[in-house]
């Protein structure tokens, strides 16, 4: 291949993946949404790829994934990897962007708990294989140990390290560039206007009206201000499924995974995305938000203009989650339960955040973000 990747052929095996269709939504560079089934690859095929391309053998297990086929390769109890077979709908430059990002982090911040690329035996960070007549790109990365954050009990004690780790990640990404970084992505808060047409797929009237107001406020109060704020490549998806914690000490972050939604966007959108999943159920809905922001600010100081937009950006991220999930569920009813798994909690959080006055919200955040740190 002209880009240096090697194409290898693998025989067809019976798929061990669920025969229930799982669909992935991928935004193209032309801002048009493409829908493509997740590639069907068996554990046998994945193991053959590992052996031929990476010279590795062991036990292969299927992992969950919305867009790609992911596998855990256990070579020894102390040596594990994640093999990712990338969705054919993902543009090659977007895949290269994610690979380049991980290589950049390995060089700039080797101490960060993020996946590390294992090159092929030919020394390539990616390879390309043909399965059932379809060319698919493949990436092998280190498998990070830890318990998914969503399985751990909510803990305010985790927030300082989580916020600090995200800030250190963003510090490492500062200055990183790639031609595909400025891609069109539905999950990019700074492009929230592209999701508004999907409001028609929200069936509940009260929720529909609330979401409409959220998008209206974004258009009038947020979008104009975002254009003046600093931008860089961000992770853009620090949800509890993409954070790993120490199972014996769930106040310690052991991994940040899944850079599939990384994008060049306003830095404050990184913080807003993470905080959209940290609205508490207790008497103080900002119980986890405040220590997270304080720790982030300590490592990556936020400006007053950025802090002032956080409440609306958090609400907008929740609006994206609710709208996109219900649109996809209407298209793929067989996968409805999985697609809607986060909707009830997200709707509850959006309603809660609406009860908190904007000035009060901003004041509490400013109190833990001293000017002299900026």
Model-derived regions: residue spans:
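An alpha-helical support segment within catalytic cores of ATP-dependent transferases
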Residues: 39-50, 177-178, 193-236, 246-248, ...
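Active-site acidic catalytic loop and adjacent metal/ATP-binding pocket
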Residues: 66-77, 82-83, 117, 219-269
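ATP-binding pocket architecture of kinase catalytic cores
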Residues: 79-177
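A cross-family kinase active-site recognition segment
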Residues: 149-209, 229-231, 337-342
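Active-site activation/catalytic loop segments of kinase-like enzymes and analogous catalytic loops
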Residues: 267-301, 315-333
């Amino acid at each position: 291949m002209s880009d240096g990747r090697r194409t290898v052929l693998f025989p067809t095996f019976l798929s061990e993946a669920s025969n229930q269709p799982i669909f992935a939504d991928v935004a193209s560079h032309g801002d048009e949404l493409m829908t493509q089934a997740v590639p069907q690859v068996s554990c046998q095929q994945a193991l053959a790829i590992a052996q031929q391309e990476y010279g590795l053998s062991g036990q292969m297990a299927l992992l969950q994934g919305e867009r790609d086929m992911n596998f855990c390769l256990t070579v020894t109890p102390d040596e594990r990897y994640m093999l990712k077979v990338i969705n054919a709908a993902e543009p090659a430059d977007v895949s290269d962007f994610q690979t380049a990002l991980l290589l950049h982090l390995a060089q700039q911040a080797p101490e960060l708990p993020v996946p590390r690329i294992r090159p092929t035996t030919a020394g390539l960070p990616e390879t390309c294989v043909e399965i059932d007549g379809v060319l698919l790109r493949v990436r092998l990365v280190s498998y990070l140990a830890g318990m998914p954050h969503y399985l751990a009990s909510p803990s305010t004690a985790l927030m300082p390290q989580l916020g600090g780790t995200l800030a250190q990640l963003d510090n490492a990404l500062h200055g990183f560039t790639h031609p595909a970084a400025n891609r069109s992505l539905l999950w990019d808060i700074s492009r929230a206007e592209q999701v508004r047409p999907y409001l028609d797929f929200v069936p509940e009237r009260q929720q529909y009206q609330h979401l409409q107001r959220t998008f209206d406020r974004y258009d009038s109060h947020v979008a104009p201000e975002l254009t003046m704020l600093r931008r860089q490549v961000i992770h853009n998806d620090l949800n509890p499924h993409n954070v790993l914690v120490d199972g014996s000490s769930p106040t310690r972050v052991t991994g940040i995974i899944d850079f599939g939604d990384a994008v060049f966007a306003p830095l404050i959108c990184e913080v807003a995305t993470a905080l959209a999943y940290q609205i508490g159920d207790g008497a103080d809905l900002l119980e986890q938000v405040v220590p997270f922001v304080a720790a982030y600010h300590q490592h990556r100081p936020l400006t007053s203009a950025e802090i002032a937009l956080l409440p609306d950006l958090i609400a907008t991220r929740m609006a994206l989650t609710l709208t996109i999930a219900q649109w996809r569920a209407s298209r793929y009813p067989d996968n409805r339960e999985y697609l809607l798994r986060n909707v009830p909690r997200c709707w509850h959080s959006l309603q809660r955040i609406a009860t908190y006055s904007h000035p009060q919200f901003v004041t509490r955040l400013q109190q833990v973000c001293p000017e002299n740190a900026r």
